[in-house]
From Swiss-Prot:
Source organism: Pseudomonas sp. (strain KKS102)
UniProt entry tagged with the keyword Manganese: yes
UniProt cross-references to NCBIfam families, sorted A to Z: 4OH_2_O_val_ald, PRK08195.1
Record-given protein name: 4-hydroxy-2-oxovalerate aldolase
Similarity comment text for this entry: Belongs to the 4-hydroxy-2-oxovalerate aldolase family.
Enzyme class: lyase
Length: 352
């Protein structure tokens, strides 16, 4: 049994933004942050779903700017630290400085699981600002445990004090998680913390988070009602209930989280955050969870099945940042269906 305090990192106001196409109002953000703060989570991540400056044609326009959301949270929190997410190439060090000035004190610098080298500038600048810098290795199922650990070691060398296994596709099994944390332990300094960011596409979000803690993981990402991309993240209230049952020290107020999940967050969902045919396809095919809403829009526009688009994206091993390829895949599928339709027509012949 683990006796250490588990660091609870809430992502409702960042990853959860994907579930409602980045349309949180400032008042909703303020209300949710206040509930989370009173429930004593350790940090609250705030940004567009795709991180600082993610609001764009490619990723979807936000109802407000990142700074407006961060300032709203800063106006109500008294206990939790404010975190934000930055993807190099989308957000810049100038955006990071603005987020710091607005109240963010932790930045998770996110890269694809094989591209840790592009995080150097941003991690170093975060440390220069006095921020806590966290390395966030997305789509972790696409790398071997040892390969992922070497990428984490790079982030550590740049100044990251915590490195995450990020299951962006919700595709990792419990053994997959176990092996990745053991690989991290083999190469990272003892003082470098580790974290798990799970998605629930195979219904393993909570189970994988528990396995991570059993393997010595320090931090768990979770969200109220699982609010997040795809089938959502590990539901915060469910993970906390499980941790409570196991006698783990989490420091949060379970009933307050349960009330916030059902009374405040779940009613905001315009599409239920759950495991269904489409979100299951994400986990099965190992597809970036935030592709869901974009793929549904493309399927509706071109008269296709969302699942077919997602499975093809997985076959092509598309990764975060390639949202523009979703329409290309849809058009290719449409062309293929038309080709099959033409060649399936019976050929008429004239009798002699």
């Amino acid at each position: 049994m683990t006796t250490k305090k588990i660091y609870i990192s809430d992502v409702t106001l960042r990853d959860g933004s994907h579930a409602i196409r980045h349309q949180y109002s400032v008042e909703q953000v303020r209300t949710i942050a206040k509930e989370l703060d009173e429930a004593k989570v350790d940090s609250i991540e705030v940004a567009h779903g795709s991180g600082l400056q993610g609001s764009s044609f490619n990723y979807g326009f936000g109802a407000h700017t990142d700074l407006e959301w961060i300032e709203a949270v800063a106006s109500v929190v008294k206990h939790a630290k404010i975190a934000t997410l930055l993807l190099p190439g989308i957000g810049t060090i100038h955006d990071l400085k603005a987020a710091y000035d607005a109240g963010a004190r932790i930045v998770r610098v996110a890269t694809h699981c094989t591209e840790a080298d592009i995080s150097k500038q941003h991690i170093e600048y975060a440390r220069h600002l006095g921020m806590e810098a966290v390395g966030f290795l997305m789509m972790s199922h696409m790398s071997t445990p040892q390969g992922l650990a070497q990428q984490a070691k790079l982030m550590e060398s740049y100044g990251a004090t915590c490195c995450y296994v990020v299951d962006s596709g919700g595709a990792l099994s419990m053994d997959d998680v176990r092996m990745r944390f053991r690989a991290f332990k083999d190469v990272l300094k003892p003082e470098t913390e580790t974290g798990i960011h799970a998605h629930h596409n195979l219904s393993l979000g909570v189970a994988n988070s528990i396995v991570a803690i059993e393997e010595g993981c320090d931090r768990v990402d979770a969200s109220l009602a699982g609010m997040g991309a795809g089938a959502g993240n590990a539901p915060l209230e469910v993970f906390i209930a499980a941790a409570e049952r196991m006698g783990w020290h989490h420091g949060t107020e379970l009933y307050k989280l349960m009330d916030a999940a059902d009374d405040i967050v779940r009613p905001l969902q315009d599409r239920p955050v759950r495991v269904d045919r489409e979100t299951l396809a994400l986990g099965y095919a190992g597809v970036y969870s935030s592709f869901l809403r974009h793929s549904e829009a493309a399927a509706q526009k071109y008269g296709l099945k969302t699942m077919d688009i997602l499975v093809e994206l997985g076959r092509r091993r598309m990764v975060g940042g390639q949202e523009d390829m979703i329409v290309d895949v849809a058009l290719d599928l449409l062309k293929s269906l038309e080709h099959e339709r033409i060649h399936a027509q019976p050929v008429s012949s004239e009798a002699g």
